[in-house]
């Protein structure tokens, strides 16, 4: 691991990549943490850049040096996602692991876990997580590639499109996915079904996240069905046709080469793959939690204790190892710093890193600037700010408000559907906020650093989707 002044992994005043802070529990993230520093490199001979992964007061915060993560992303993009044959081979392999997980889900659903012996429970846990590890190793390709591919495409286009606004508009169109998202898939299915109970059994996991799981009742789906547009499927298909036509128009307008179009297509496919992956992750989180609750019951742990454990530590608990003291130490804060190896961080180290890298803003600042991810219907729009730090707590969010968040993930979808515009502290043109805002046709500015601190609930703001500025209206 590299060192900067004061043994910091990255220069706090340099170019920093942040994911979060958002609600989350370490256990639900522990598999991909292990994959990112160890298993991914073992299979693909490439690795994530040095990372801080911090957990404090129910929230999680991921930090990288931006130049490093982009460089790592470009390598993986060029090696594994851009070559069509390689991309298809890895995607097919991932589909195989997904199919295995779905079979294991049926086993978990039909088993009475309380009647399994410790040996049987351990076997179930290990088999499940070995497959889940393989699922994550292969599907980390589009995620890591995403962090470098956008910059790579932009550099190619800059030689052709000199106007910055035209460049960003072309980027927005070229990187847009051309397949229906899993939330659209669920809404279309809901709009067409007459069997709400069957639909609930298929999609009960819809609001799961790394912060926790819940089983949604039939009432949740029945209420939403009554408000759905009956033409959802037709409109979604028309939107995809429109997106495809816009890509062709951009290619013709700027005489873009097949090479550039292939780069854009690979990025678009990677974004779609990540969305599909998230659907399965939500299902996986449920089944992990079902097994975890049995471990908690059987071995006299609280589930909150186990949410601070690595997935492989659960196997140790089943083998009768006492981890109460170890997990208690993580209660007030826990983190990891990893590259080729992984160092666990205590509460004090975690808090110090958090304070060092969390975005700070001057009190007099009344404007932020980011990348325009979706123009919406007009180049300038106004609205009232509603800051959402927890996507599972949006009860007071009103139709037409401006959603301001650290970043968005699929759990934010229900607030985004009400929003008049979306502003995020972090993210790029291929981020979740960007993709969903385009689907909804609302203005979106991503990577507007510090927005959740500059603005407060009730502020009136103006969003300029030409310049990417968000201004407080006095």
Give the location of each predicted region.
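Non-catalytic, soluble scaffold/interaction modules
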Residues: 1-474
């Amino acid at each position: 691991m590299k060192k900067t002044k004061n043994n910091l992994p990255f220069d706090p005043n340099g170019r920093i990549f942040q994911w979060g802070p958002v609600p989350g529990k370490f256990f639900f993230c522990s598999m991909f943490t292990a994959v990112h520093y160890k298993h991914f490199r073992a299979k693909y001979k490439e690795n994530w850049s040095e990372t801080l992964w911090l957990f404090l007061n129910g929230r999680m915060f991921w930090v990288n040096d931006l130049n490093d993560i982009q460089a790592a992303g470009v390598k993986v993009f060029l090696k594994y996602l851009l070559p069509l044959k390689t991309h298809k081979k890895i995607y097919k392999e991932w589909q195989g692991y997904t199919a295995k997980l779905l079979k294991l889900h049926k086993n978990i659903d039909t088993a009475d876990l309380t009647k399994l012996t410790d040996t049987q429970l351990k076997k179930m846990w290990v088999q499940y997580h070995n497959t889940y590890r393989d699922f994550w190793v292969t599907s980390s390709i589009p995620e890591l590639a995403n962090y470098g591919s956008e910059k790579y495409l932009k550099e190619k286009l800059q030689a052709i499109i000199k106007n910055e606004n035209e460049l960003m508009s072309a980027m927005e169109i070229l990187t847009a996915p051309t397949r229906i998202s899993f939330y659209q898939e669920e809404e279309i299915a809901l709009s067409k079904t007459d069997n709400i109970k069957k639909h609930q059994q298929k999609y009960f996991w819809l609001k799961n996240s790394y912060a926790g799981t819940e089983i949604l009742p039939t009432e949740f789906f029945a209420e939403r069905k009554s408000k759905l547009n009956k033409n959802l499927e037709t409109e979604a298909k028309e939107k995809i046709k429109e997106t495809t036509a816009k890509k062709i128009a951009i290619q013709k307008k700027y005489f873009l080469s097949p090479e550039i179009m292939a780069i854009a297509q690979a990025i678009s496919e990677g974004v779609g793959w990540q969305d599909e992956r998230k659907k399965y992750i939500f299902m996986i989180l449920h089944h992990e939690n079902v097994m975890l609750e049995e471990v908690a019951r059987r071995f006299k742990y609280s589930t909150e204790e186990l949410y601070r454990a690595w997935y492989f530590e659960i196997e140790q608990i089943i083998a009768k190892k006492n981890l109460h003291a170890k997990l208690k130490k993580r209660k007030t804060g826990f983190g990891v710093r990893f590259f080729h190896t992984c160092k666990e961080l205590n509460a004090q180290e975690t808090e110090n890193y958090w304070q060092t890298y969390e975005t700070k803003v001057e009190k007099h600042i009344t404007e932020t600037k980011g990348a325009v991810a979706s123009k919406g219907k007009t180049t300038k729009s106004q609205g009232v700010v509603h800051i959402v730090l927890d996507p599972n707590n949006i009860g007071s969010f009103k139709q037409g408000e401006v959603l301001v968040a650290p970043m968005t993930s699929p759990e934010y979808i229900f607030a985004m559907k009400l929003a008049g515009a979306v502003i995020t502290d972090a993210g790029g043109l291929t981020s979740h906020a960007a993709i969903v805002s385009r689907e909804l046709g609302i203005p979106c500015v991503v990577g507007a650093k510090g927005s959740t601190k500059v603005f407060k609930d009730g502020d009136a703001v103006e969003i300029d989707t030409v310049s990417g500025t968000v201004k407080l209206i006095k």
